Amino acid sequence: ICEQIIDELWTGDFYKTSLGHFDFFWMRDFGTVAESLVRLGRKKHVIHTLKWALMHYRRSASVTTCIDKHGNCFNAPMHAVDTLPWLLHCIHVSGYDLNKSERAFLEHELRKYTRKYLDTTGHVRPIKFAEMRDAVIYDRSAYAVALVGRMAYCVEQLGLQDFPYKLQKYQKELITRYWNG
């Protein structure tokens, strides 16, 4: 049954999120399953999905939460702190080989991300943005910090530039600010 569902979610260009209402590409949803899809032998489709998404992101000059089947990029319900981290996670876990222009685009997006979501010390800014539960407004949740940390790790693994903070910063913050055990 699960294999049939995965087959139905493959459009030929990308993995859509749902067979129902949300029948387009959501970066967060894809990010949570990309590694599992690779392990299930779907690496070719994961790579194809990433190539398709990167093409549309580059055309729109922005990494967004969603892309419809026509390639229109948009944020729903609003810009999200986890979109770029999930994209870089997918690129890393799939072994996607970035070309020169994709690298340049992602490094530009990293600079934009750093200015928008992080303060000068690398901490997540206290601004409104979407994250795991879009209808809930958080103030710098552990999820947001963890995803920025994951992004820092992926940036290093992918050899990308223009993200000045290291994974250890976010590991330390999660323990000192969020762990209460």
Set out the residue ranges of the language-model regions.
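Alpha-helical structural motif
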Residues: 1-2, 102, 109, 170
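Catalytic cores of carbohydrate-active enzymes
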Residues: 62-66, 121-130, 137-181
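Aromatic-rich carbohydrate-recognition surfaces in CAZymes
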Residues: 23-120, 145, 149
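Charge-dense, low-complexity intrinsically disordered segments
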Residues: 20, 40, 100, 135-138, ...
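Active-site-adjacent bridging/hinge elements
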Residues: 2-13, 58-64, 121-128
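Active-site-adjacent structural elements in folded domains
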Residues: 15-21, 70-74, 129-139
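Low-complexity, Ser/Thr/Pro/Gly-enriched N-terminal "stalk/linker" regions
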Residues: 1-25, 47-52, 173-175, 179-180
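Alpha-helix C-terminal capping segments
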Residues: 1-9, 37, 91-98, 151-162
